[in-house]
């Protein structure tokens, strides 16, 4: 059997209390990397002990074997349990080949509103439905109350980091794309516009920044499409790295073999196009690189936290090359998941609760009046406008959170904010930036 942690027991207690309150369909929120699969396995094991049959539904094939291994390790009774991919289970339900369960457990339950999941749920109206997710939110802002009666909330990401259940992280950010070219399609950026927003030189930038900040670390790179994923993998191979590209067209056996090679170190750079996010469990993955701009909070959290599985003395590296933090903040930002569940997102997407220090470029939470790194006083600051970044290099400013990049020369700067950043990178005083701003006509 697997020994659960205190917060996992608390989560199970919350589920049982919700069931005692006559809720039959319950969503359970717990952060990525918090051990949802272990918690699920204990829920199933306890149900089996009471002779209850449990059906567990997952949305990707490689997760079937991953979850099944955990279930076996926790002594789940396979005579009363079944784990399967949603499409497979749905087809079997239509044919009447699934024995009625007492409980339906859904992994990554933010997908559960789709037709295939509903077909399964509706086929067994008397069953309890327990859906686990790290991100109870939808791209269109609608909630989940049309399917679930209640939500049980787990510990926050900050709590898990502070209590050594998730690894702390260092967030490095640059902006290598032209955001003006990004166009929306069904609430998300279209693939065509993403491709147009990227400069071809980005593939070299990915390698350069990896070697500068994460060289030797096992890394997952989230590319924006299959072609870009292949190009990035090839760029790394040319430099002698053990890199491999995978996408949804790869056969199941190939995907499982590649994942195992990544786990045991035969592959150290894994590039993919939206394939390895949810539920992909590799504790020794130390770095993720984001090459896919997204307005999906769920996708952002799933990808950024893939490197935050806990190991002693580990610090995850998150390299954001598309400025996703400016939309979604940071992995451990406070979020009111109850409001998301109810379909009442707490604020507009454009209103972020982090800010950038104009003196040292550290990115901190907005409620801080003084920069903890350089002591800059925000109460006397004049608000600047947002800016785009071109021809830049990553530079580490602080031990954690986001580090922005520096410009090459004054003539490339389009605002005083950019000039002050350049001055900082050159170790010049702010007065130099002011003088350059006068020359460039940025100050009247």
Where do the PLM segments sit?
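Conserved segment of the helicase C-terminal RecA-like domain
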Residues: 307-332
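Walker A/P-loop
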Residues: 22-43
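Post-DEXD/H (motif II) to motif III coupling segment of the RecA-like Helicase ATP-binding lobe
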Residues: 111-171
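A short beta-strand element within the Helicase C-terminal
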Residues: 269-272, 278-293, 316-320
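Inter-Walker segment of RecA-like/P-loop motor cores
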Residues: 64-100
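Conserved helicase ATPase core of P-loop NTP-dependent helicases/translocases
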Residues: 65-69, 231, 242-273
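Conserved pre-motif I regulatory segment
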Residues: 1-27
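Conserved interdomain linker/interface between the two RecA-like ATPase lobes of SF2 helicase motors
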Residues: 151-220
């Amino acid at each position: 059997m697997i020994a659960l942690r205190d917060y996992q027991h608390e989560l199970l207690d919350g589920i049982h209390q919700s069931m005692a309150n006559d809720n039959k369909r319950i969503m359970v929120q717990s952060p990525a990397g918090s051990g949802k699969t272990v918690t699920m396995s204990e829920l199933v094991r306890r149900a089996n002990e009471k002779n209850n049959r449990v059906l567990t539904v997952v949305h990707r094939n490689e997760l079937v074997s991953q979850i099944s291994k955990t279930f076996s390790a926790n002594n789940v009774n396979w005579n009363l349990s079944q784990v399967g991919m949603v499409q497979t289970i749905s087809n079997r339900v239509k044919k009447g080949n699934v024995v009625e369960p007492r409980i339906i457990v859904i992994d990554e339950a933010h997908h559960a509103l789709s037709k295939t999941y509903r077909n399964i749920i509706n086929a067994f109206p008397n069953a309890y439905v327990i859906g686990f997710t790290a991100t109870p939110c939808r791209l269109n802002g609608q909630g989940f109350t049309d399917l679930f009666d209640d939500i049980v909330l787990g510990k926050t990401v900050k709590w898990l980091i502070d209590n050594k259940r998730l690894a702390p992280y260092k967030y490095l950010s640059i902006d290598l794309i032209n955001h003006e070219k990004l166009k929306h399609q069904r609430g998300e950026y279209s693939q065509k516009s993403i491709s147009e927003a990227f400069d071809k030189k980005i593939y070299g930038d990915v390698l350069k920044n990896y070697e500068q900040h994460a060289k030797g670390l096992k890394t997952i790179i989230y590319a924006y499409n299959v072609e870009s994923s292949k190009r990035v993998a090839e760029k790394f191979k040319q430099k002698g790295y053990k890199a491999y590209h995978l996408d949804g067209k790869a056969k199941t056996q190939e995907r499982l073999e590649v994942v195992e090679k990544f786990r045991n170190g035969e592959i150290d750079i894994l590039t993919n196009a939206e394939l390895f996010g949810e539920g992909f469990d590799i504790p020794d993955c130390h770095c993720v690189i984001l090459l896919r701009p997204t307005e999906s909070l769920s996708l952002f959290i799933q990808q950024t936290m893939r490197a935050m599985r806990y190991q002693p003395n580990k610090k995850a590296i998150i390299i954001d090359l598309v400025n996703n933090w400016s939309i979604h903040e940071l992995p451990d930002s406070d979020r009111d998941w109850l409001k998301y569940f109810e379909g009442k997102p707490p604020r507009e997407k454009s209103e972020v609760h982090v800010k950038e220090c104009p003196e040292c470029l550290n990115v901190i939470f907005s409620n801080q009046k003084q920069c903890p790194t350089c002591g800059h006083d925000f109460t006397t600051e004049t608000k600047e406008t947002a800016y785009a970044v071109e021809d830049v290099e990553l530079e580490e400013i602080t031990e954690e959170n986001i580090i922005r990049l520096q410009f090459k020369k004054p003539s490339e700067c389009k605002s005083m904010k950019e000039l002050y950043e350049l001055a900082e990178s050159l170790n010049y005083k702010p007065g130099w930036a002011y003088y350059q701003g006068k020359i460039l006509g940025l100050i009247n």
